[in-house]
Amino acid sequence: MPANSAKEAERPPTWKVLVLATRPNTLAASFTPVLVGFAVASRELGALDPAPAFRFWVFACLIQIGTNLHNDYADFVKGADTDDRVGQARATQKGWLSPGQTAGLSTAALVAAASIGASLARRPGCGGWMTFVTITSVFNALAYTGGPFPLGYVGLGNVSIGYSGLGDVFVFAYFGLVATLAPYYLALEAGAPRALFGLLLTAGVYASG
């Protein structure tokens, strides 16, 4: 059986392909730090409206999904994901999604995240820092292993956040500091050292990477 036919024969249902492409096993790293930040704020202030924290959680999940999809796309077009790859299935490498489809899904997730980030930035006292978080989160999602165009195609080889040794730094900053402190800032407009316990989730992201 030709390779393409074999890949098509083993293709899961479309809904399952889409779920697998988002790497749902990694998404706890978006949920838990947000929960910790909101819990600390609630402990210090009492009853709080959970809506801003929930919206930020959706924002964080969409950023992570967009990052995962773009990583799937970039690793495939740059030749990092081949048929010899060992580990969790990658939708583009398996031929379940075309590179264009994966990139399009990544773009959709990041646009949705940016729209939520923009709405959170309109909250009193949140405009500057939330705008910064939104813009840099989208940039990091695209630059983690590829950038908006495969960097190997523009003469930069494998220079990217993930392949340059900076990946852990950005994971620490955004899945640790930002994801934990943002819900707290949205509720209190001030930071708290105890919220930094959410940084422990960074270890989980390292392991999944």
Predicted features, each with a name:
Residues V34-V36, L45-N71, F132-L142, A192-G209:
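Membrane-embedded alpha-helical segments that form the functional core of polytopic membrane enzymes
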